[in-house]
């Protein structure tokens, strides 16, 4: 079953074409990697899938439904976007992990959060650690598990391993492999060969088009 289907999707900004006639499918539980030169439109595709911007032509279907007709807050619990530069809030790690639950008036499960920290090799005391004290790799791990705590069906990853050291990259790749093994879907933009090798499908994007 396809979790995503893009049909002749286009995106433009002030008459400048960014994406042209983008068509592809993503199977449920698949790992898809988008590759290509910088500025080719890869990140724009992720933003369309995340509902952060709207296509100017064509249609994007999520589980058979046009995403333009879906309730976005509900959709974004199913489809979670991870930025290359982690966006963190508040003073502490716990503030960050709890924030999405607070704004949705949902209960925060601290035990689950501690297990998530452990899965990325961060000790329990990290919950009280200040964001300003975290390294770049630690910030990326916190941002990633914040997204995973909602148990989304799809993770959209925009070069999240860029700038990570080898040890942190290994930890993150293990977490992503476990996430996919549970039947979830990964769609990523990356230049990292180990991540490209882990994909079931690779699409090359050049000049705002899918190259075949």
Which residues does each predicted region cover?
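Helix-to-loop junction immediately C-terminal to a conserved catalytic motif
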Residues: 50
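Conserved ABC transporter NBD signature motif
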Residues: 58-66, 75
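Conserved ABC ATPase "signature" region
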Residues: 108-126
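Conserved ABC ATPase signature
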Residues: 130-134, 138
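Hydrophobic anchor residue at the start of the ABC signature
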Residues: 144
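Catalytic Walker B motif of ABC-type/P-loop ATPase nucleotide-binding domains
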Residues: 155-158
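Helix N-cap at the start of a conserved alpha-helix in ABC-type nucleotide-binding domains
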Residues: 166-168
């Amino acid at each position: 079953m396809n979790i995503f289907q893009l049909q002749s999707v286009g995106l433009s900004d002030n008459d400048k074409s960014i994406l042209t006639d983008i068509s592809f499918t993503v199977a449920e539980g698949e790992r898809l990697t988008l590759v290509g030169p910088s500025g080719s439109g890869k990140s724009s595709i992720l933003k369309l899938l995340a509902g952060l911007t709207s296509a100017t032509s064509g249609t994007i279907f999520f589980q058979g439904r046009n995403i333009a007709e879906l309730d976005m807050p509900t959709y974004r619990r199913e489809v979670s976007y991870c930025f290359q530069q982690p966006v963190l809030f508040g003073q502490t790690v716990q503030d960050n992990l709890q924030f999405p639950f607070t704004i949705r008036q949902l209960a925060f499960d601290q035990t689950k959060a501690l297990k998530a920290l452990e899965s990325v090799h961060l000790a329990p005391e990290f919950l009280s650690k200040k964001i300003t004290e975290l390294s770049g790799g630690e910030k990326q791990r916190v941002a990633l598990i914040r997204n995973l705590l909602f148990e989304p069906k799809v993770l959209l990853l925009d070069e999240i391993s860029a700038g990570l050291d080898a040890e942190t990259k290994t930890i993150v790749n293990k977490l992503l492999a476990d996430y996919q093994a549970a039947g979830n879907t990964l769609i990523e933009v990356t230049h990292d060969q180990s991540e490209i090798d882990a994909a079931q499908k690779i699409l090359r994007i050049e000049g705002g088009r899918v190259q075949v």
